[in-house]
Amino acid sequence: LSFPVHETLMVEPTESEPKAELDRFMQALVQIKRECEEIRDGQADAEDNVVKMAQHTAGEACADVWPHPYGREKAVFPLRWVRENKFFPYVTKIDGGYGDRNLCCTCGSLSKE
């Protein structure tokens, strides 16, 4: 995947990608489109929806409280084959563009004291 033009996505699979993997990728894109249509059609909350709030960590998925209007199943296992191949991210979304524009140093002091 690459982002050659602002707000675009280019998908260029290599010859080493098996067709089954490309098919799963396409299924995921179709599912995301369906979820976007739910937002467009008013079936999903415009702010708190599975598209905007993805990805969900294991901690969030297993927490006692689920603060979202959509179900955990939809959030964590949107497609049947995901259940058998699920891996959980350590963090939710990171706004890389925001981080690039608003640098925040978290390292210790660099002075020689």
Predicted regions: what they are:
Residues L1-E113:
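Non-catalytic terminal extensions of PLP-dependent enzymes
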